[in-house]
């Protein structure tokens, strides 16, 4: 079990990785993300709930094809089974943390770039067929 008591805003601001798993427990997982200007998280659907808190930057949330703006201090709840994407429409990285319940990624997951994350997801799906 991971116990976490840190300044999450500072950790998010310092994060340079597209995806960085910070803590994983049996029923939840904490992940930091940094999305470059003009990029997105990627259209996806999870079998778990996801809560995203945006620390800095600006963009657009797309939940089941409905678009809405996001900015610093936005919180978005994505229920399991909801198709979603988050797009950075600003000029600076979109910085956020995400809580999955239960965990979505393997403990220790770290992707320097979105391309690394996409490649890892493809490998994961091939291995788990």
Q: Which residue stretches match the model-derived regions?
A:
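Histidine-centered metal-chelating micro-motifs
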Residues: 40-41, 60, 76, 80-86
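Short, conserved beta-strand element in jelly-roll/cupin
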Residues: 34-36, 46-61, 99
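A generic "binding-loop/recognition-motif" signal
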Residues: 26-28, 37, 47, 66, ...
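Short, charged/polar surface micro-motifs in flexible loops or helix N-caps
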Residues: 26-28, 37-39, 58-60, 102-106
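A short, N-terminal "cap"/entry segment at the start of jelly-roll beta-barrel domains
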Residues: 1-27, 111-129
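Ligand-binding loop in jelly-roll beta-barrel domains
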Residues: 80-106
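Conserved short histidine dyad/triad with adjacent acidic residue
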Residues: 16, 31-45
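Short acidic-glycine-tyrosine-enriched beta hairpin
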Residues: 66-80
């Amino acid at each position: 079990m991971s116990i976490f008591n840190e300044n999450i805003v500072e950790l998010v601001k310092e994060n340079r990785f597209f995806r960085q798993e910070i803590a994983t427990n049996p029923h939840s997982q904490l992940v930091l993300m940094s999305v470059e200007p003009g990029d997105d998280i990627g259209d996806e659907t999870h079998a778990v709930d996801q809560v995203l808190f945006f620390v800095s930057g600006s963009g657009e949330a797309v939940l089941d094809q409905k678009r809405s703006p996001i900015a610093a201090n936005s919180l978005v709840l994505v229920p399991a089974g909801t198709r979603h994407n988050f797009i950075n429409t600003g000029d600076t990285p979109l910085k956020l943390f995400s809580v999955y319940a239960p965990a979505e990624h393997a403990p220790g997951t770290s992707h320097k770039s979105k391309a690394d994350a996409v490649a890892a997801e493809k490998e994961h799906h091939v291995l788990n067929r």
